[in-house]
C-alpha cells in the first residue's frame, strides 16, 4: 500500500513529506530541492511549476502566477487591493468569486494551486517508487470554511484523496513534539509568505491539544516585500518621474529584488539593490537603471505598522487560552518570515523567552502533516498520538434585527456539533431563510456569509410558535454541515458549506479532467526531452571516441562523424521520427566503430604494448620553468 504524504501548500514555497522508519522525512523534488516555489507559469501549451517557473518570471510576468494562496477561497471584494499589485491579471469571476486571467483564459485559484500539488506529488511518487494518491494538506489556522474547502478542492483537482485538512501551527507542533517527553505548553508563532497564525497547545503523553488560535490571513512575508517595492518605486519616481509599478516586467523584477533584500537583511545590517536596465526612458528610449542601498533600520521603519500587527494575535491567543506569557514553556517559530530579526525581537518581548529554533521553519509544517497522515493510516511506529484541534472563528446564524446568533464559538474543539431551537418572526410564516455566518462581529452584515438555504412548508401558526431545530456540525477538516428541521411538520432542509468559491461539482470534475490531460501532455513532453537528451549524450560519446581513437580507419571515422552530425541536426529539429532514426543509426555506427577498434588493439604485436609501457616508464615527471 502506498504511503500517504503530508503537504504544506504554502504561499511562497511548498513542501511534501512522508513517514519513513518511524520519522517524518522531507521528499526532495526532481531538481533536488527540499522546498518547491509555489509558482506556476503558462508558456504556450506548456505549464511550468516551481523553480523553472520562477526563473522565467521576469520575462513572462503576465502569465507567471505566485502567492495564489492569498486568493484561494476568497471573494473578489475581499482581495481587490491585493489583486491590484499583482503583475498578472486578477479579476472578479462568477458570483463575486476571484479569477486569474492568463492568455485569454480564466483560471480559478484552486486550479493554479492544483498544479503545485501535482508537481509535488509527481516528483515524490518518482522518488518513492509508488504512485501517491492520499494526502494530508495543511492550511493556516485562521483560514475560514471557504478557504479550507477550496484547498480541499485543489487537492481533488490534482487527483488526490485528501484525507484531512489540518492547521499549519498544529502540524508544526506535531513535528516538534513527536519525540519529546513530559508536559509542555507551547506557543507556535507561524508567519509565512502570506498568512500569520498563533496557536497555543498543551503537549503531553501523546496528546496534542490546541487551547486557542488567532491570526491574520492578510499578513505575511509578501507584505514586507511590497513595502520595499513601494519604497524603491517611489524613490525611482522622484528621480525619473516614472512609476515602475505600471510596467509589469519592471514590477516583477522589483518584487524579486525586494524579497532578496529582505532575506539579506536577516543576516546583514545593509544590502545593495541593483537593477540595471530596469526600464527605458519613454521619450529618448535610453536605458534606465536602479541602484539603492537599504539598511535594516530603514526596512524596519518601512514595515513598522506590519510589525505592530504581529502583536495583537499573540495577546489574543494568550487571553483566549486563559494563560499568561509566563505559562508558556516553549515558543516555536514557523514560516520563513520568522527569520526577520525584528519579528524575533517582538516574539521574545511578548513571551519573555528566547524562541526554540530546533525545528526548521520551512519544513516543520510538512513534517507534522506527514505525522498526521501516518496516524490516519495507522502507522504503528507512532503509538497512540491524539490530536485535538479547534475551530478558529465563531459560527452562527442571522436572526431578527440583522444580528448574529452564535452557534459554535471560536476555539471550540473539533469535530463539534451544536443544536439550537429558533422560531418564526411573523404570523403564518411559510418558511425561513437561514444565513450561515462566520466571524466575531455582532452584526450579521459585518461577518462572512458562508451560505444560505431555505426551509419551506412550515404549517400556518402564530409567530413564535414554530420550533425550528438548527444543527451545526463541523467535521475533523473544519468543514461545516448545517441542517434545519421544523419539529411540528417534520420538514427538513440542509446545506454543506462548500462550493463557496463558486466551484460546483461540475467545475471540479472538469478541472480534474483538464489536470489529467495536462499530466498526459507533460509526460509526453518529458519523454520527448529525455529522448532528445539521450541522443545528444550519445553524440557527445561518439565525438569523444573520434578524438581518442585518431588511429582508427578513416572510413569508419567518416561514417561515425556523419552519424554524429545527423544526430546533432535531429536534436535541433525536435522531430520525433528524425530523433528515433538518428538514435538507431548512431548506436549502430558507434557499436561498429568501437568493435573494430577493439579488434585492432587486440591484434597488435605483443611487443608493441610492452614498448609503449617501457616508454612510459622512461618518462620523468618534472616542473619546468616557463620560458621568459
UniProtKB/Swiss-Prot annotation:
Modified residues (Phosphothreonine): 195
A molecular function (GO) term: unfolded protein binding
Compositionally biased tracts (Basic and acidic residues): 555-591, 614-628
Segments for region (Disordered): 547-628
Polar residues: compositionally biased ranges: 594-612
Function: Acts as a chaperone.
Designated name of the protein: Chaperone protein DnaK
Organism whose genome encodes this protein: Deinococcus radiodurans (strain ATCC 13939 / DSM 20539 / JCM 16871 / CCUG 27074 / LMG 4051 / NBRC 15346 / NCIMB 9279 / VKM B-1422 / R1)
Species classification: Bacteria, Thermotogati, Deinococcota, Deinococci, Deinococcales
Gene: dnaK
Amino acid at each position: 500500500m502506498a504511503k500517504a504524504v503530508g503537504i504544506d501548500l504554502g504561499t511562497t514555497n511548498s513542501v511534501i513529506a512522508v513517514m519513513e522508519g518511524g520519522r517524518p522525512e522531507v521528499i526532495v523534488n526532481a531538481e533536488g530541492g527540499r522546498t518547491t516555489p509555489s509558482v506556476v507559469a503558462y508558456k504556450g501549451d506548456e505549464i511550468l511549476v516551481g523553480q523553472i517557473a520562477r526563473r522565467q518570471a521576469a520575462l513572462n510576468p503576465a502569465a507567471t502566477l505566485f502567492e495564489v494562496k492569498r486568493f484561494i477561497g476568497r471573494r473578489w471584494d475581499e482581495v481587490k487591493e491585493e489583486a491590484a499589485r499583482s503583475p498578472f491579471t486578477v479579476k472578479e469571476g462568477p458570483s463575486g468569486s476571484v479569477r486569474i486571467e492568463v492568455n485569454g483564459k480564466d483560471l480559478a485559484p484552486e486550479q493554479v494551486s492544483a498544479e503545485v500539488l501535482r508537481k509535488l506529488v509527481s516528483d515524490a511518487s518518482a522518488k518513492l517508487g509508488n504512485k501517491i494518491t492520499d494526502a494530508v494538506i495543511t492550511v493556516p489556522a485562521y483560514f475560514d470554511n471557504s478557504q479550507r474547502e477550496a484547498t480541499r478542492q485543489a487537492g481533488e483537482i490534482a487527483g488526490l484523496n485528501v484525507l484531512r485538512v489540518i492547521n499549519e501551527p498544529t502540524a508544526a507542533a506535531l513535528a516538534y513534539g513527536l519525540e519529546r517527553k513530559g508536559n509542555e505548553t507551547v506557543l507556535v508563532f507561524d508567519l509565512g509568505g502570506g498568512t500569520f497564525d498563533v496557536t497555543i497547545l498543551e503537549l503531553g503523553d501523546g496528546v496534542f491539544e490546541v487551547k486557542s488560535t488567532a491570526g491574520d490571513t492578510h499578513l505575511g512575508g509578501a507584505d514586507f516585500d511590497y513595502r520595499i517595492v513601494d519604497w524603491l518605486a517611489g524613490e525611482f519616481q522622484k528621480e525619473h518621474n516614472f512609476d515602475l509599478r505600471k510596467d509589469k516586467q519592471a514590477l516583477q523584477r522589483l518584487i524579486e529584488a525586494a524579497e532578496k533584500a529582505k532575506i539579506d537583511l536577516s543576516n546583514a545590517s545593509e544590502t545593495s539593490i541593483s537593477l540595471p536596465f530596469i526600464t527605458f526612458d519613454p521619450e529618448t528610449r535610453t536605458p534606465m537603471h536602479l541602484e539603492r542601498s537599504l539598511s535594516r533600520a530603514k526596512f524596519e521603519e518601512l514595515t513598522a505598522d506590519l510589525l505592530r500587527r504581529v502583536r495583537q494575535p499573540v495577546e489574543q491567543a494568550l487571553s483566549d487560552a486563559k494563560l499568561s506569557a509566563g505559562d508558556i514553556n516553549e515558543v516555536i517559530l514557523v514560516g520563513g518570515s520568522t527569520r526577520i530579526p525584528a519579528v524575533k525581537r517582538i516574539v521574545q518581548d511578548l513571551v519573555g523567552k528566547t524562541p526554540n529554533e530546533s525545528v526548521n521553519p520551512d519544513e516543520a509544517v510538512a513534517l507534522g502533516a506527514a505525522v498526521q497522515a501516518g496516524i490516519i493510516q495507522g502507522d504503528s511506529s507512532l503509538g497512540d498520538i491524539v490530536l485535538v484541534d479547534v475551530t478558529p472563528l465563531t459560527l452562527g446564524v442571522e436572526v431578527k434585527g440583522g444580528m448574529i446568533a452564535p452557534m459554535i464559538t471560536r476555539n471550540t474543539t473539533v469535530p463539534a456539533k451544536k443544536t439550537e431551537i429558533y422560531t418564526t418572526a411573523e404570523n403564518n410564516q411559510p418558511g425561513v431563510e437561514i444565513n450561515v455566518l462566520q466571524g466575531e462581529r455582532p452584526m450579521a452584515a459585518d461577518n462572512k456569509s458562508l451560505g444560505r438555504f431555505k426551509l419551506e412548508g412550515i404549517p400556518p401558526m402564530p409567530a413564535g410558535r414554530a420550533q425550528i431545530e438548527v444543527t451545526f456540525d463541523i467535521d475533523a477538516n473544519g468543514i461545516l454541515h448545517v441542517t434545519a428541521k421544523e419539529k411540528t411538520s417534520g420538514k427538513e432542509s440542509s446545506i454543506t458549506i462548500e462550493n463557496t468559491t463558486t466551484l460546483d461539482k461540475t467545475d471540479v470534475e472538469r478541472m480534474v479532467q483538464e489536470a489529467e490531460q495536462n499530466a498526459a501532455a507533460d509526460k509526453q513532453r518529458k519523454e520527448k526531452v529525455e529522448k532528445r537528451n539521450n541522443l545528444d549524450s550519445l553524440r557527445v560519446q561518439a565525438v569523444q571516441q573520434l578524438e581518442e581513437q585518431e588511429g582508427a580507419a578513416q572510413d569508419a571515422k567518416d561514417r561515425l562523424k556523419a552519424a554524429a552530425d545527423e544526430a546533432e541536426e535531429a536534436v535541433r529539429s525536435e522531430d520525433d521520427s528524425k530523433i528515433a532514426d538518428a538514435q538507431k543509426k548512431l548506436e549502430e555506427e558507434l557499436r561498429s566503430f568501437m568493435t573494430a577498434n577493439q579488434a585492432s588493439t587486440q591484434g597488435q604485436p605483443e611487443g608493441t604494448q610492452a614498448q609503449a609501457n617501457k616508454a612510459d616508464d622512461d618518462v620523468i615527471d618534472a616542473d619546468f620553468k616557463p620560458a621568459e
